[in-house]
């Protein structure tokens, strides 16, 4: 079993999940980019935008509606929050934004109960897409969605050429699977296992999107535990 699947099976078994929102974000597409991928600001505009300190991403925020904006839709009872990475440069911010889109789109698919939701696939290689689809399908087969809240923090990115390494922590202590039909929440004890470290290798494609070519997770990671 992969580290990624093991990490999210913890979601299902112990009631810890990272997931979506009935939150709508319209963001600028990458159509204005030049052949070199455009500016970092343009590269980072599709998907979930970094927000000021620990502010929920979603309907509580006024998104900049732009031509060809993208929709992120997550369960009504769920909040996904990204802490900013103020020390990242413009290019690194583009990587962090695309990794955030991947993360949010994955849980959009979980929330919709649709393992074939196309959005997460735009930000993942075939191998990563297959891993994520397996997890989404598990939720779908059990009739689960997600509820509660997840905080994504300690986000980092390092770029070497057209390859980047991104990492982020997910605090999922307040997130749980919920039976879609009954609304029953699968509560369980939480602890250090509720802090997950995600690592992704990302490569920029011809459209300027940073796509995850590998993705792993680690539970109770020291780098993610509260100090």
Where are these predicted regions, by residue range?
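Secondary-structure junction/capping motif
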Residues: 1, 89, 189-190
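Secondary-structure transition/hinge residues
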Residues: 1, 107-111, 206
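Bacterial N-terminal signal peptides that target proteins for export
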Residues: 1-8
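Juxtamembrane and targeting peptides
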Residues: 9-97
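Structured, amphipathic secondary-structure segments that form assembly/contact surfaces
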Residues: 16, 115-226
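Aromatic side chains
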Residues: 21, 103-107, 210
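Core segments of small alpha/beta cavity-forming domains
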Residues: 68-145
């Amino acid at each position: 079993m992969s580290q990624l699947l093991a990490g999210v099976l913890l979601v299902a078994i112990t009631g810890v999940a990272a997931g979506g929102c009935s939150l709508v974000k319209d963001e600028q597409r990458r159509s204005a980019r030049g052949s070199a991928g455009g500016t970092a600001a343009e590269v980072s505009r599709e998907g979930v935008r970094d927000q000021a300190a620990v502010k929920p991403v979603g309907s509580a925020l006024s998104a900049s509606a732009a031509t060809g904006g993208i929709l992120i839709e997550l369960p009504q009872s769920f909040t996904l929050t990204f802490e900013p990475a103020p020390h990242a440069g413009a290019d690194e911010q583009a990587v962090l934004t695309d990794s955030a889109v991947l993360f949010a789109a994955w849980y959009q698919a979980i929330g919709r109960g649709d393992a074939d939701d196309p959005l997460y696939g735009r930000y993942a290689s075939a191998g990563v897409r297959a891993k994520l689809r397996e997890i989404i399908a598990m939720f779908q087969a059990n009739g689960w969605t997600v509820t509660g809240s997840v905080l994504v923090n300690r986000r980092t990115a390092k770029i070497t050429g057209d390859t980047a390494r991104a990492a982020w922590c997910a605090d999922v202590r307040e997130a749980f699977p919920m039976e879609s039909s009954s609304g029953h929440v699968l509560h369980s004890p939480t602890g250090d296992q509720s802090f997950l470290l995600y690592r992704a290798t990302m490569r920029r494609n011809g459209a300027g999107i940073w796509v995850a070519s590998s993705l792993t997770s680690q539970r109770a990671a020291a780098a993610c535990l509260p100090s």
